[in-house]
Amino acid sequence: SDSKIGDGCFGLPLDHIGSVSGLGCNRPVQNRPKK
């Protein structure tokens, strides 16, 4: 699930970078995957 979050925002797998995903960039993507 986290891996898809980073994909929609930075285009990179933030699956191991939970801190970066907490910026709120993955929050909207979490509900609706851009991919």
Curated annotation (Swiss-Prot):
Keywords: Disulfide bond, Hypotensive agent, Secreted, Toxin, Vasoactive, Vasodilator
Major place of residence: secreted
Tissue distribution of the protein: Expressed by the venom gland.
An annotated Gene Ontology molecular function: toxin activity
Plastid as UniProt keyword: no
Gene Ontology annotations for the cellular component aspect, listed alphabetically: extracellular region
Subcellular location: Secreted
Single GO biological process annotation from the record: regulation of blood pressure
Disulfide bonds: 9-25
InterPro entries assigned to the protein according to its UniProt record, in alphabetical order: Natr_peptide (IPR000663), Natr_peptide_CS (IPR030480)
Domain of life: Eukaryota
Protein family: Belongs to the natriuretic peptide family.
Function summary: Snake venom natriuretic peptide that exhibits vasoactive and probable hypotensive activity. Is only weakly active on natriuretic peptide receptor-C (NPR3).
Further remarks about this protein from its record: Negative results: does not activate natriuretic peptide receptor-A (NPR1).
Protein name in the entry: Natriuretic peptide TNP-a
